């Protein structure tokens, strides 16, 4: 071992092998060799291993809350079912209601474009109204048919979507059929719904 004069600078061990470390020190840049401690060897090996086999990144999980009981796509190709509220609006009871007054008026997907002009011209009037499936003007879901059930009586009707609404907002006559003439008394109810065929609402196949 070589002796050094003067005070030592802080030394940094550099392991050349599991048992020998070099220590840089002194003014004349001499090199002092000393055995590595067992801890130094273990730490050195552990650090090298961590660079060779890094731990995989943690995966993040996201939770999407359900809204209105719907865990479904509203695309026309997807099957839709769930639970929403249903109310009524007497304007849909008017057979002379012009379809220019509803969301599903004209446009490529509009009901006027398909040959209908008034609420009464629709094949299953008065079982018509607004539905959550209609996102806005020219929606692909204009004219979409739903089977709507009131669990209290286990009674169902088929409803044609002609307007935009939260849940379903149908003709009073339609709600009376569903509730055994209790629409005026109940005002709003919870219903279940599912996709139905266009023919269920009277449209041609």
From Swiss-Prot:
Keywords: Allergen, Secreted. CDD domains: DPBB_CEPL-like. InterPro entries: Cerato-platanin, RlpA-like_sf. It comes from the Eukaryota. It is found in: Secreted. One of its GO terms (cellular component) is extracellular region. Induction: Expression is up-regulated in presence of human keratinocytes. Belongs to the cerato-platanin family. This is Allergen Asp f 15 homolog.
